[in-house]
């Protein structure tokens, strides 16, 4: 479920990234918007080819969400517009409505105001990004190290190359009575096993900042997820036995 069409170019860019996503490229898409660019009454053909259904209606209305079969969706993506900051509030309320009625649906949204991010957890919203923070942060990094944007573009696109991932499985699910181990020993084990990953850090909870490049002596907790770079998603749970065995030999 995709909510809002801030512009056709942005929406098509989102469709392109979804086409590259192994998790979402084969899932039918429903587009919901209260209005279209240029006050169009119908979506153009180049966009209609990328979706299954388009529903014109107020996304924050429960009736509209039911027409869109929101309860059957795997996820809902909300897009925002810098020219309409109030859309952040509407998106937050709509995403909160989905979480209240269908908590199994993954909800993520872009925020034109950075302060909106702080409200997402209150409504049970699963994730969000601040377009303003990203833009300003990248601008200064590009100033300090020209070319950093190309690195970011490589990592943030689903079209190929390397991406940043967060492991689906928690460290504690890798095995019963697993002894605690350090971040450094995990990196050494991954290197010696020639795993196709570059371990960057850990993520404790969705609402916390990830711990990137921590000290090697940091002990991983059972609820921690691995933040890593790879060309495709790595099956940590499926490879956990040999990883733990290698770590055991190191200690």
Task: Mark where each language-model region is.
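Cytosolic regulatory regions of ion transport systems
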Residues: 1-251
């Amino acid at each position: 479920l995709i909510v809002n069409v801030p512009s056709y170019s942005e929406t098509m860019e989102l469709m392109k990234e979804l086409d590259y996503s192994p998790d979402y490229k084969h899932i039918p898409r429903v587009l919901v918007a209260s209005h279209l660019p240029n006050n169009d009454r119908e979506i153009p053909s180049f966009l209609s080819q990328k979706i299954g259904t388009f529903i014109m209606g107020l996304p924050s209305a429960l009736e509209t969400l039911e027409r869109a079969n929101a309860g059957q969706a795997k996820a809902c993506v909300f897009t925002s517009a810098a020219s309409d900051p109030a859309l952040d509030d509407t998106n937050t309320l709509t995403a909160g409505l989905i979480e209240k009625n269908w908590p199994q649906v993954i909800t993520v949204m872009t925020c034109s105001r950075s302060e909106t991010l702080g409200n997402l957890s209150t409504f049970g919203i699963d994730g969000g990004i601040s377009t303003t923070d990203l833009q300003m942060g990248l601008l200064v990094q590009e100033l300090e190290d020209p070319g950093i944007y190309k690195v970011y573009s490589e990592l943030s696109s689903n079209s190929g190359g390397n991406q940043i991932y967060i492991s689906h499985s928690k460290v504690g699910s890798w095995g019963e009575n697993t002894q605690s181990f350090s971040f450094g020993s995990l990196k050494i084990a991954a290197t010696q096993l020639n795993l196709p990953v570059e371990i960057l850090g850990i993520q404790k909870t969705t609402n916390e900042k990830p711990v990137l490049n921590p000290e090697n002596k940091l002990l991983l907790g059972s609820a921690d997820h691995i933040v890593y770079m790879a060309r495709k998603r790595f099956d940590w749970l499926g490879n956990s036995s040999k990883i733990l065995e290698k770590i055991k030999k190191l200690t």
